[in-house]
Amino acid sequence: MKIRPLHDRVIVKRKEVESKSAGGIVLTGSAAGKSTRGEVLAVGHGRVLENGGVKALDVRIGDTVIFNDGYGVKVEKIDNEEVLIMSESDILAIVEK
């Protein structure tokens, strides 16, 4: 896949997770909901500051992140693979390994 996000944008591939109900029943499809975790595939150069400088992003390629799946997150298909394009500010946390 050849895609380069601009500025503070990040390309994330959603990680599918198995969901279980409180009773231990495995939920699939729409009942399970969409995961808000993903792997960072590409990052932009950084956020442009008011003084013209650039602040590097905190996330790196390969990081597993938890993100806010809402307004501002763009879903695209690239090479038949669904990816999310979001600002770094839409990322809530980096999952430490």
UniProtKB/Swiss-Prot annotation:
Its main location: cytoplasm. GO terms for cellular component: cytoplasm. Keywords: Chaperone, Cytoplasm. Transmembrane segments: none annotated. SMART domains: Cpn10 (SM00883). Disulfide bonds: none annotated. One of its GO terms (biological process) is chaperone cofactor-dependent protein refolding. Pfam families: Cpn10. One of its GO terms (molecular function) is protein folding chaperone. It is found in: Cytoplasm. Heptamer of 7 subunits arranged in a ring. Interacts with the chaperonin GroEL. Together with the chaperonin GroEL, plays an essential role in assisting protein folding. The GroEL-GroES system forms a nano-cage that allows encapsulation of the non-native substrate proteins and provides a physical environment optimized to promote and accelerate protein folding. GroES binds to the apical surface of the GroEL ring, thereby capping the opening of the GroEL channel. Belongs to the GroES chaperonin family. This is Co-chaperonin GroES. It comes from Blochmanniella pennsylvanica (strain BPEN).
